[in-house]
């Protein structure tokens, strides 16, 4: 297990990190759109198969550390190897996760009526793929981009039947609330790429996939209640 410093979990999700605005100077404080040349520069700095690690919250893997003011803390984070890529097809730039381990979501499902689902998910060795549209947002002072992920889908056998289970991320709301849940950046210090996703919850055998009605992840870690889950992909 490797300690990841730039990773946090909160009960009520806000932005995975604070986005820096490139303002036009007017009173409306709007962000200046990137030019096509700037978007191409962003693409060149992020494309390829760079992020090969996944970090996620897990109380099965605890690291103790001491803060700068000499206070002992515990960090509930584990890491796994994954395969990701960012490529453009002439229309959209897309981030693809090729072997996502859905079993990690079992930790975020609790309740007596969810035991069969939880156990089936814990035993699931299937790795699934999912895609996210990349929208480049700023080039300077920090290269940042929004991510619009599709639902993560897996078929699970439990209770004598096959069930389709879909996992949903929170939706970004750039305007007017400026709540950014799924996004990425290039670290200015290391020039390494990282991306964050905030998961809301799941739906079993959805009746209307165009209008999902997911159940929120609700669980406790170190006796503290949490809603939702955050995962991070990063370049080692």
Language-model segments: which ranges?
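Edge beta-strand at a domain terminus
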Residues: 27-34, 167-236
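Tryptophan-anchored aromatic micro-motifs
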Residues: 40-66
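Bacterial Sec-dependent N-terminal signal peptides
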Residues: 3-8, 15-44, 230-236
